[in-house]
Swiss-Prot record:
The lineage of its organism: Eukaryota, Metazoa, Chordata, Craniata, Vertebrata. The chain crosses the membrane at residues 234-254, 264-284, 298-318, 529-549. Glycans are attached at residues 52, 165. Keywords: Cell membrane, Disulfide bond, Glycoprotein, Ion channel, Ion transport, Ligand-gated ion channel, Membrane, Postsynaptic cell membrane, Receptor, Signal, Synapse, Transmembrane, Transmembrane helix, Transport. One of its GO terms (cellular component) is postsynaptic membrane. Residues 357-439 are annotated as: Disordered. Residues 358-367 have a biased composition (Low complexity). Residues 1-20 form the signal peptide. This is Neuronal acetylcholine receptor subunit alpha-9-II. Expressed in the brain, liver, olfactory mucosa, pituitary gland and hair cells of the saccule. It comes from the Eukaryota.
Length: 550
């Protein structure tokens, strides 16, 4: 072990001597090479020959892609190789020294620049050292952050792909003085750092020889095309999916009840939300003629929502047209109320979907009810004569059972011949204020069967029914006679005419309510129809827009 220590020390001393000797030779070599050398002239022995420069680009990172300003910021490693005829030596004269590294500012360098540069700073690559070999070959590796102009096509945003060019060439030397060659057929991507927004699918290179108008000599250049594909997941979840969900709210506006008063508000709110998303996309896109795919989707959705809001206003106008409007046309009754209501499952509350009846039949029955010339002793028998067996509605039956009117005791009446009377509305002008004369003396008459039932009224207007019953009770006594016997002389004709007039008013009110209900049902069926139409439109539009993505 002790014998090995002197050997190691001797070897270390030899290495130090060798390094110091090599350092002395390198210093001597640099002094000899730079003694009569000038870096201002093109280093060729024959000035008529072109100097060949080999260019190789390594793409390290895509730092940013500014679509609005159309600028690509990339981090590159640029390698240039050429031969200097004045920087050669015999390696045997310098202890076998083959390679030295010297500052690049000491030697001649080709003036290769990025033609499509978009940076305000015109500085080139860093002044790193060059590698000089004994045969005159110089290799210069320099990093550079480039800002190049790139024509951005956003027609398929966010599913777009871009092609950005990096064109390198000599700024002052033409092709007869400096010829540029490609070191590889494409850029080197072996050290590429993945970008979170863009995928790089390649970097092919092409050589071009261009004759410019200013000069008659050819100028060669090398163009590297960076193939970029956008990662669309971010935009799908932050721009496309919210728009897709919001667009499905537009058809639901037709499902809202018209009486809620929120149908138009929903459409306007959805329209404003899409406008905000549209402005966000417009701010990030360049102001060009090409409209991005997501912009087309927004515009189509906004157009659909505008149309749905306009249709909602139209349908609400139908819903609230009221009884003063014209009756529903026959074709609308047949097409909308009879057929479309069954297709779109539009039924009234409490109506059996299996045995749905049209409201037009009930309205026709009401009109017959008001035009019948034969009146029975009470309202119940009158309705049976007009095709309404069992009473007018369930509410009237419940009213009779819950509030039975007591029978007033009186002498038993024998059946006598009855007289039926009927008047029209044209006779109401002939009714004088003396039509109630003589009735006060008959307040103690026995009550008939008609007093067991409340007068008919519109089932949709309970307040009107109560008021009408009160008016009848105050005017004619404890009940309204529907018919009279021949034992009431002097009162029967006037009383019957007044009762007929009141009954006609109630019938007319029922017909008016039925007409308004028909318009409401038409509006409800149209709401359901447009709801399904717009649901289908939203779905198909989304499929078509996404299907256009490359």
């Amino acid at each position: 072990m002790r014998k090995m220590v002197p050997v190691v020390c001797f070897a270390t001393m030899l290495l130090q001597v060798a390094h110091s000797a090599q350092g002395r030779y390198a210093q001597q070599l640099l002094t000899d090479l730079m003694e009569n050398y000038s870096n201002a002239l093109r280093p060729v022995e024959d000035t008529d020959k072109a100097l060949n420069v080999t260019l190789q680009i390594t793409l390290s990172q895509i730092k940013d892609m500014d679509e609005r300003n159309q600028v690509l910021i990339a981090y590159l490693w640029i390698r240039q190789t050429w031969h200097d005829a004045y920087l050669r030596w015999n390696k045997e004269d310098y202890d076998g020294l083959e390679v030295i590294r010297i500052p690049s500012s000491l030697v001649w360098r080709p003036d290769l620049v990025l033609y499509n540069k978009a940076d305000d700073d015109f500085s080139g690559p860093l002044d790193t050292n060059v590698v000089l070999r004994y045969n005159g070959e110089i290799t210069w590796d320099a990093p550079a952050i480039t800002k190049s102009s790139c024509v951005v096509d956003v027609s398929y945003f966010p599913f777009d792909s871009q092609e950005c060019n990096l064109t390198f060439g000599s700024w002052t030397y033409n092709g007869n003085q400096v010829d540029i060659a490609m070191g590889m057929d494409s850029g080197d991507l072996s050290d590429f750092v993945e970008n979170v927004e863009w995928e790089c699918h390649g970097m092919p290179a092409t050589k071009n020889v261009i004759m410019y108008g200013c000069c008659s000599d050819p100028y060669p250049d090398i163009t590297y095309t960076v193939l970029l594909q956008r990662r669309s997941s971010f935009y799908i979840f932050n721009l496309l999916l919210p728009c897709f969900l919001i667009s499905f709210l537009a058809p639901l506006g037709f499902y809202l009840p018209a009486d809620s008063g929120e149908k138009v508000s929903l459409g306007v709110t959805v329209l404003l939300a899409l406008t905000v998303f549209q402005l966000m996309v417009a701010e990030s896109m360049p102001p060009s003629e090409s409209v991005p795919l997501i912009g087309k989707y927004y515009i189509a959705t906004m157009t659909m929502i505008t149309a749905s809001t306009a249709l909602t206003i139209f349908i609400m106008n139908i819903h609230f047209c009221g009884a003063e409007a014209k009756p529903v046309p026959h074709w609308a009754k047949v097409l909308i109320i009879d057929y479309m209501s069954k297709i779109f499952f539009v039924y009234e509350v409490g109506e059996n979907c299996a045995t749905a009846t049209s409201s037009s039949s009930s309205s026709s029955s009401s009109s017959h009810f008001g035009q019948d010339d034969v009146h029975q002793p009470n309202f119940s028998s009158h309705r049976q004569a007009n095709g309404k067996p069992g009473g007018n509605s369930g509410r009237e039956n419940q009213y009779r059972h819950k509030n039975p009117r007591p029978q007033t005791p009186g002498p038993q009446r024998h059946p006598k011949p009855r007289h039926q009377h009927h008047i029209t509305r044209d006779e109401k002008n002939h009714l004088s204020s003396s039509k109630y004369e003589g009735f006060e003396s008959n307040r103690n008459l026995p009550l008939g069967d008609c007093c067991k039932e409340a007068p008919p009224c519109c089932p949709e207007d309970e307040k009107t029914a109560v008021v009408a019953a009160a008016v009848a009770s105050v005017t004619f006594g404890p009940c309204v006679f529907c018919s009279h016997g021949s034992s009431l002389p002097g009162v029967d004709s006037k009383l019957v005419r007044n009762v007929e007039y009141i009954a006609n008013c109630f019938r007319e009110q029922r017909a008016t309510c039925a007409k308004g209900a028909e318009w409401k049902r038409v509006a409800k069926v149209m709401d359901r129809f447009f709801m399904w139409i717009f649901f289908i439109m939203v779905f198909l539009m989304s499929i078509l827009i996404i299907g256009k993505a490359p």
